[in-house]
From Swiss-Prot:
The name this protein goes by in its record: Matrix extracellular phosphoglycoprotein
Gene name for this UniProt entry: Mepe
Signal peptide: 1-24
Subcellular location: Secreted, Extracellular space, Extracellular matrix; Secreted
Organism from which the protein derives: Mus musculus
A Gene Ontology biological process term: skeletal system development
Amino acid sequence: MTPEGLMKMQAVSVGLLLFSMTWAAPMPNEDRSSCGNQDSIHKDLAASVYPDPTVDEGTEDGQGALLHPPGQDRYGAALLRNITQPVKSLVTGAELRREGNQEKRPQSVLSVIPADVNDAKVSLKDIKNQESYLLTQSSPVKSKHTKHTRQTRRSTHYLTHLPQIKKTPSDLEGSGSPDLLVRGDNDVPPFSGDGQHFMHIPGKGGAGSGPESSTSRPLSGSSKAEVIDPHMSGLGSNEIPGREGHGGSAYATRDKAAQGAGSAGGSLVGGSNEITGSTNFRELPGKEGNRINAGSQNAHQGKVEFHYPQVASREKVKGGVEHAGRAGYNEIPKSSKGSSSKDAEESKGNQLTLTASQRFPGKGKSQGPALPSHSLSNEVKSEENHYVFHGQNNLTPNKGMSQRRGSWPSRRPNSHRRASTRQRDSSESSSSGSSSESHGD
């Protein structure tokens, strides 16, 4: 055979071997090759690229060369590996990509599932928000209703208290006592000169007002009278009078004096002095009994002075009148004996008998009343005639006047101050004079 025929035969045999080996190739080799050992691949490629020369051996013995090719298995395996390696590498790459995709798919699925769960949660949140929105829509109505009820309650509570605030009374004294509203609007309790209430003391037969009495007004058609406590008018609202014993003895003597005299005495019935309205004091001198002098309104610019009638007994002209005269001076010592008291009586006797005769010219010396006293010795001389003049006007016209028609004059702070000082000094001097007279006797 020619060498060309041999070469063809070898090529065919190699092809068959390669075909048979590709089908009968072991799997572990494929697994090893699939593991991707690059060093072995490079070695196989080098072996396949540079095979051992076999021409000489084949030329010598063609049949032996055909039957026993040198390193045929090795070369065939190397060729098969070189041929199949790229294919398997491609397959493994696709598989790896598929595996990577499969590994990624669960992640995406997991990511999708929480998204669904999140959607469900969002839907639940939306439902809750809807419910809360509905609740908020319903709750403002409730809150408005509660606010309205609270406002109505507060408003009604306030309205219940409003009439109490409006019904608070205010009387003339400013005490706010609701009991005073039972009486009429013009029914005001009487006042003394210094702003204190009148305190009437009921007597057996009545008593004439002495020089230290605060105020007295004649009652129509009655010769008896009630005496006002002289110490209560000068004291404060919380002070307690300390001369109850002296006052009782003085009232007893005045009761007898008033019964013996039979003349019109000052009187005051508690609660009967009612202010019936505003009074024009300019019309009083000619109509209401000359309570105020005709020139005193303009001379004193509205200041009112009180002038009161006084009654003394016939039996005790000297003692009673001189006792009242001593009440005008605080200079008489309390522990004086016969000489000092007699000097004071002699010095005052003439003056007081003259004033008594001027005030009762028709009835003699027995009815001569005492002059109302003051504490200021400098003002006695200047005001003696003034008071006597008013005393004459006061006695006769006031005898038949009704107490309802008479009205109280306007109150002034100066007159209050002077009246209060006179009342206090007169009460103190009367008590001191009575003690000195007892020591002198």
